[in-house]
Amino acid sequence: MSQPAELSREENVYMAKLAEQAERYEEMVEFMEKVAKTVDSEELTVEERNLLSVAYKNVIGARRASWRIISSIEQKEESRGNEDRCTLIKEYRGKIETELSKICDGILKLLDSHLVPSSTAPESKVFYLKMKGDYYRYLAEFKTGAERKDAAENTMVAYKAAQDIALAELPPTHPIRLGLALNFSVFYYEILNSPDRACNLAKQAFDEAISELDTLSEESYKDSTLIMQLLRDNLTLWTSDISEDAAEEIKEAPKGESGDGQ
């Protein structure tokens, strides 16, 4: 039987959309990785980069949710002194962490080898550097010791590089700039345990966007105002958390044009 012909770029994009409709996100990642590896000469379109982002976000999101649930159960069993169960849970958590590491390594390699070097427009540079920061942050969520320190440092470098371009080149209301501010502030809060810096970054991004709200184009109005609402939600949560220990869910940038999210 003859080998099936390689799919064209357009066919891979179409297959990725099919996989998304079928909620087969691992395959969606595979199709979009093939597309991403063709971008040495030309950048991904906005649609293509959003498909790539959504694919990876769903694949990583399922594991991050699993890890949080298992870690929560582990803490409960530890507090009850159930050592035998804790041993089982730790092994199972390790399996999830191996999957998380593999997914993060996959997208980070793709970003470093193809997507970041091929990007020329400020918008796409910020998008990919933010994505790089996001996936290093996901590593920092579960790594420990020197590995956690390295992941946190790499997150900071990527977010800072994205921020430098965003502040210089994108308007304060741009959904990608807002999504970056949202996720960068989450990094300060969750990974670096710096609530003051998290609040300052989120508040500044929100205030700057509010002051230019009348300049928003119709197409990005919905995306921008959604992220502004998430910034405000986190600020409310964090300012109350500084005085009392709030345990509500911290918001990240949604999937799609603004980048990624939970």
UniProtKB/Swiss-Prot annotation:
Belongs to the 14-3-3 family. Induction: By wounding, drought and salt stresses, benzothiadiazole (BTH), ethephon, methyl jasmonate (MeJa), hydrogen peroxide, abscisic acid (ABA) and incompatible and compatible races of rice blast fungus (M.grisea) and rice bacterial blight (X.oryzae). Ubiquitous. This is 14-3-3-like protein GF14-E. Transmembrane segments: none annotated. It comes from Oryza sativa subsp. japonica (Rice). PROSITE patterns: 1433_1, 1433_2. GO terms for cellular component: cytoplasm; nucleus. Keywords: Cytoplasm, Nucleus. It is found in: Cytoplasm; Nucleus. Is associated with a DNA binding complex that binds to the G box, a well-characterized cis-acting DNA regulatory element found in plant genes.
